[in-house]
A protein has these predicted regions:
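Canonical Radical SAM [4Fe-4S] cluster-binding loop centered on the CxxxCxxC motif
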Residues: 2-37
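Flexible mid-to-C-terminal extensions adjoining Fe-S/redox cofactors in radical SAM and related proteins
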Residues: 261-317
Length: 317
């Protein structure tokens, strides 16, 4: 059996917001949820091929599904993985606006991590609704949670302010740029590369020398680990995520990433294969693997290559 895999599951592409940087255009945000039969089949394949797995419930907005859905999910996980918490874990990535005390209590009971997409004081730049009240409740109730902030053209030079905002709250934070896909292909949300780099360097310098900081700022924290000798350098928490990471859409189709993947990278469908190894033998996977190899060969002579590993296959541009 292989050691582990991370599986992003998009149980729905529907969302209660219309964020200007979303990977999915309004036409893609259709009603239609993943079936429990598809999940049952997926969990069976994962449990047969991997020692452990981490499931990330994404979207769309996963909280548009009722809590009864997630109770059924937990029952299916127990069916295939048993009660061994070392074999399986879960994170729900949400915009936070639909979180309530009842679901937070359920997450605590089942040790489900909560990831909230939130830009703090700059939230209105990209989003319509603000989850601050829900985030405060997560903190008060001792839920395991973290925040992901997306850096736009407007906030590229304000990353340091974002870091300070979340540092003062003691909130684990990850920063990532808007990528030119989906809704972000239109408008002016994608940050200027020079501004983004400048803002990132300023934030890294402050975080590195901040004696009061108790949060592992991502991706900067990973760069430090790489510098200190991590054997598998990357700007992704999953190192070279290819073969260790997949995304499953509501219809069961498999892609190598949760970000905006073109159809050419489609790796098959959960309902049409008997093992995940088939997905990793697909033409779609071979295409993204070839592109990754070509990019790394191009980047290999760069002095910082050993720390970033050529970047992410989906947003290195």
């Amino acid at each position: 059996m292989k050691p582990y895999i991370s599986v992003v599951i998009k149980p729905t592409l529907y969302c209660n917001e219309s964020c200007s940087h979303c990977y999915h255009t309004p036409g893609e945000r259709i009603l239609g949820n993943i079936s429990l039969e598809t999940l049952d089949r997926l969990f069976e394949m994962v449990s047969n091929e991997y020692q452990s797995a981490w499931f990330i419930w994404h979207g769309g907005e996963p909280m548009t599904l009722p809590m009864s859905f997630y109770k059924s999910v937990m029952e299916l996980e127990e069916k295939h993985f048993g009660k061994n918490t070392f074999r399986v874990g879960n994170t729900i990535q949400t915009n936070g606006t639909l979180l309530n005390r009842r679901f937070m209590a359920y997450c605590r009971e089942k040790a489900i991590n909560v990831g909230v997409s939130w830009e703090g004081p700059y939230n209105s730049v990209l989003r319509e609704l603000d989850p601050e009240k829900a985030v405060s409740m997560l903190s008060d109730k001792d839920n395991r949670y973290s925040v992901s902030s997306t850096i736009s053209a407007e906030t590229a030079l304000k990353q340091k302010e974002l870091y300070r905002f979340f540092r003062d709250r003691g909130t684990n934070l990850s920063l990532s740029p808007v990528i030119p896909a989906g809704c972000a292909r239109c408008g002016n949300t994608v940050p200027d590369p020079d501004d983004y780099i400048r803002g990132s360097i300023e934030t890294f310098d402050e975080w590195l020398h901040d004696a009061d900081s108790k949060i592992p700022l991502v991706p900067h924290y990973l760069y430090v680990l790489n510098y200190l000798g991590d054997p598998t350098p990357s700007d992704c928490a999953h190192t070279s995520c290819l073969t260790k990471w997949i995304c499953v859409n509501p219809d069961g189709s498999i892609y190598p990433c949760a970000k905006a993947c073109p159809e050419e990278f489609r790796m098959g469908n959960v309902n049409e294969i008997s093992a995940l190894s088939e997905a990793f033998s697909s033409e779609g996977f071979r295409r993204i693997l070839a592109g990754s190899v070509a990019r790394r060969e191009k980047c290999a002579s760069c002095e910082v290559y050993r720390y970033c590993n050529g970047g992410c296959s989906m947003d290195a541009y």
